[in-house]
Amino acid sequence: MFKKLLLCTLLAASGIAMAAPANPHQPSYGTWQSRDKSKSITLSSKGLNIVVNAPASCKRRNQWGQVISWVSGKQLRSDINESLELNDQLADDKGSYRAEMAAVLPKIRDNARYFKILGYLSCSDGASGLIQIDANTALLIEIAPDEFYTVVRKRKP
């Protein structure tokens, strides 16, 4: 009897876990777009559109995924400053990236935690994702292998 009860409990728990959304953070749902509309990313309960809508050839077993985490404001500031230094070394147009990041840095509080979702595929070189700053502002993150950010805003439906 105990074994049957344990089995039923485990099956029920696994069913609940399998029904859980890949992205449980509802405030992040929607399409996020850069000011010039050159970059965008869409999130839903299934996760990032770049992963959800990828062709099957890009989703080979154990070679794709989504990682959801929370990053501290202090760590995010540090990561942005590191990307600014790298951009200064690599880019011809240093001013526009620096200005874009300068506009978002005041919104980041050191003691706050920010929602972060990254997706990667076997057919791409790196990862993409989103870090939500507030209800309407986020950073599109592109890693290949260095991290660079684009300020994106939530598009109205």
Question: What are these model-predicted stretches?
Answer:
Residues 10-19:
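Hydrophobic h-region of N-terminal signal peptides that target proteins for export
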Residues 38-40, 55-133:
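Contiguous, well-ordered beta-strand patches that form the walls/edges
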Residues 1-6:
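Bacterial N-terminal signal peptides that target proteins for export
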Residues 22-63, 122:
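Short, solvent-exposed loop/hinge segments that bridge or flank secondary-structure elements
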Residues 26-31, 49, 110-119, 136-139:
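Short, hydrophobic/aromatic-rich segments at coil-to-beta transitions
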Residues 47-55, 83-84, 137-143:
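Short, well-ordered strand-loop elements centered on a beta-strand within folded domains, enriched
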Residues 129-132, 136-149:
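Short, exposed beta-strand-loop hairpins at the edges of beta-sheets
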Residues 155-157:
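Short, solvent-exposed mixed-charge patches
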